């Protein structure tokens, strides 16, 4: 007998319409409660939190409700002498938060707020001889950081600052027999890493190196009877994988391989009808992270009330058109 499949049951009274205004109100009020326990405890990833909130507000056409000046001052104060950006004031710089900062500034058309040359030098300094990237000076290697590096430089128009060929070589060395990618060579395939690697290969024009049918099959197997998607076998579904899996499928031209209606129902069931926002699963606590990826997933599914989203950068397509960054996808 095989292992029993892990899944959730969606109740008959679960939300089935998009509560857009409630989500906008939830995000708009989130940053104003600066003495909340939840807000204080998320300081270590604040820069990414700001990116999640601003991006989802822009996708909903509500960016004007956020305090642009306060955010720009915050980002400027998080850039370090080395060029990298930290999650919050007084924290160490990291590639993850450097990308988030560049995404926010691109959203606001305010890249001048930081020293771009120093950002480029910082990204450059984190590339290793084998082409991989460390996330920071402490040296953890992960394909997520390869994506962060090329995404940051692509938005700045400085992709030629690194050894792109070696970077491609490293990412391809992380490809597995099932078509997926792990965090390092030999690591298990995981939907989050697959998103990073397919996004990386889209930015570097190397998607022809991917076996789209094999990878598409692995990604489609992430869909469970509830309609939700998990990140790897034997895991529960989670709204954030509505983004990582769906965006990867869009990048490799296989979005039509999953049951879109069942996924849409699962995402909508994860809304909180009282507070607004999305949770990882129906009935759980909402947060800005799952709210962005729920809304972005619905955008990829063609939700007309939401702006079209870039499957590579998780930013509004109109923003990327403005800065002329258009990675090629598999048609």
UniProtKB/Swiss-Prot annotation:
Geranylgeranyl diphosphate binds at residues 190-192, 241-244. Its EC number is 2.5.1.60. GO terms for biological process: endoplasmic reticulum to Golgi vesicle-mediated transport; protein geranylgeranylation. Belongs to the protein prenyltransferase subunit beta family. One of its GO terms (cellular component) is Rab-protein geranylgeranyltransferase complex. This is Geranylgeranyl transferase type-2 subunit beta. The keyword Phosphoprotein applies. PFTB repeats lie at residues 20-61, 68-109, 116-157, 164-205, 212-253, 260-302. GO terms for molecular function: isoprenoid binding; Rab geranylgeranyltransferase activity; small GTPase binding; zinc ion binding. Its cofactor is Zn(2+). It holds the Pfam family Prenyltrans. The gene is Rabggtb. It catalyses: geranylgeranyl diphosphate + L-cysteinyl-[protein] = S-geranylgeranyl-L-cysteinyl-[protein] + diphosphate. The enzymatic reaction requires the aid of a Rab escort protein (also called component A), such as CHM. Zn(2+) binds at residues 238, 240, 290. Catalyzes the transfer of a geranylgeranyl moiety from geranylgeranyl diphosphate to both cysteines of Rab proteins with the C-terminal sequence -XXCC, -XCXC and -CCXX, such as RAB1A, RAB3A, RAB5A and RAB7A.
């Amino acid at each position: 007998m095989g292992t029993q499949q892990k899944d959730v049951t969606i109740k008959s009274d679960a939300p089935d319409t998009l509560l857009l205004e409630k989500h906008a109100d939830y995000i708009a009020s989130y940053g104003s409660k600066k003495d909340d326990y939840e807000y204080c405890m998320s300081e270590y990833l604040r820069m990414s939190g700001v990116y999640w909130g601003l991006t989802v507000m822009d996708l909903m056409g509500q960016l004007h409700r956020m305090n642009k000046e306060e955010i720009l001052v915050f980002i400027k104060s998080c850039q370090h002498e080395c060029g990298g950006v930290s999650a919050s004031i007084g924290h160490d710089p990291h590639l993850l938060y450097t990308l988030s900062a560049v995404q926010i500034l691109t959203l606001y058309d305010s890249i001048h707020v930081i020293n771009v040359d120093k950002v480029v030098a910082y990204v450059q300094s984190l590339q290793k001889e084998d082409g991989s990237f460390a996330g920071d000076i402490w040296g953890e290697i992960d394909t997520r950081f390869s994506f962060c590096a090329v995404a940051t430089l692509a938005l700045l128009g400085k992709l030629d600052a690194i050894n792109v060929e070696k970077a491609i070589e490293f990412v391809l060395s992380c490809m597995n027999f099932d078509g997926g990618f792990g965090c390092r060579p030999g690591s298990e395939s995981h939907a989050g890493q697959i998103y990073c690697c397919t996004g990386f290969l889209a930015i570097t024009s190397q998607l022809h190196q991917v076996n789209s049918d094999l990878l598409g099959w692995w990604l489609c197997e992430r869909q469970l009877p509830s309609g939700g998607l998990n990140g790897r076998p034997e895991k529960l579904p989670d709204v954030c994988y509505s983004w990582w899996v769906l965006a990867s499928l869009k990048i490799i031209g296989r979005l039509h391989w999953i049951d879109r209606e069942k996924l849409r129902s699962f995402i909508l069931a994860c809304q909180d009808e009282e507070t607004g926002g999305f949770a990882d699963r129906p009935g759980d606590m909402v947060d800005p992270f799952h709210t962005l990826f729920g809304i972005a997933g619905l955008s990829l599914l063609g939700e007309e009330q939401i702006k079209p989203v870039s499957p590579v950068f998780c930013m509004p397509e109109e923003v990327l058109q403005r800065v002329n960054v258009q990675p090629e996808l598999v048609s």
